[in-house]
C-alpha cells in the first residue's frame, strides 16, 4: 500500500509540478515578502501567461511563447503598480481590479473559448526530449528544474544589486527610501513587473507541460503560492536570501507532493479544494504553533529549574 502511494512516479510528478509552480511562489516572494504588497492579481496573471503561451506555441514557436508570456506578465504587473503608485488605489483593491479585468482579457486571448489544446503542437518539452533522451522519462523534470534554477539565481543576483537593494528597502520602509532620494513608485513598479513576469512564465510553462490551457487554471494560485512560501520559510528559515529562495522551491515541491499523495488516497477531485485549504491553513499557522510550543517548553523548563532550586535550598 505504502509502496504504491510513495512511488517514484508520484515523486517525479510532484517535483515537476513543484518546480513549475515554484516560479509563482518566487513571484509572490518578491511582491509579498520583499515588497510587502498583497498582489491578488496572481490568479489572472498566471492564466494570462498560460493563454498567451498557448497562442504563440500554436504558431510553432514554443520558446518564443515563454518570452511572450513573460512580456504579458510584465504588462499585468505594470498595470497593478500603476493603479497603486499613480492612482492611489490600495494594493489589495488594485490586485482585485486587475484580476477581474484579466478574466475578460484571457478569454479574448483564448479566442473566447474556455479551453485550448496543444496536443498536436511542439512544446519546449517535446523539442528537448531528443537532446535529453539519456535522462529517459526525467527530461521534463530537467527542463523545469533548469527554469527554476535560472530564475532563482537571477532573483538572488538581482536582489544583491543597487536596484534590488532599493526594492528590499522599499518593502521595509518606504519613507526611508523616499528620504534617500529614491522614488518608491519606481521600485514598486519594477518589483511588480518582475513578479508578473515570473507568474506568467509559470503559467506558460504549465501550458506546455500539460499541453492545454483552461480559463480557470489560475484559480486559487495565490493561496497555493502563499502556502509554498510559508512552508519553505517555516522549515528552512529566512536567515539569508539564498535560504529563503531555496525554501520557496522546497515548499512548492513539498506542497505538490502532499497533493499527489492525497490523490493517491483516492480523494475525490471535488474535495481537492478542501485539501488545499487545509494545507494552506496548516502552513500559515505553523509559525504560531512553533512559537507556542517553544514558549511552553521554556515555561516548563523554568518550572523545573525552580523546583530543583527549591529542593537544593532545603
Give residue spans per PLM region.
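Cytosolic-side transmembrane-helix boundaries in multi-pass membrane proteins
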Residues: 6, 154, 172-179, 183-186, ...
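Membrane-embedded helix boundary and interhelical linker motif in transport proteins
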Residues: 32-87, 128-134, 239-240, 264
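Loop-to-transmembrane alpha-helix initiation sites
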Residues: 17, 91-93, 114, 119, ...
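Helix-loop-helix "hairpin" substructures at the membrane interface of multi-pass membrane proteins
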Residues: 76, 136-217, 222
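Alpha-helical transmembrane segments within multi-pass membrane transporters and channels
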Residues: 61-100, 105, 148-150, 250-251, ...
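Membrane-interfacial amphipathic/re-entrant helices at transmembrane-helix boundaries
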Residues: 1-24, 52, 58-64, 129-141
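Transmembrane helix-bundle core of multi-pass membrane transporters
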Residues: 91, 102-160, 190, 271, ...
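Transmembrane alpha-helical segments in multi-pass inner-membrane proteins
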Residues: 199, 203-274
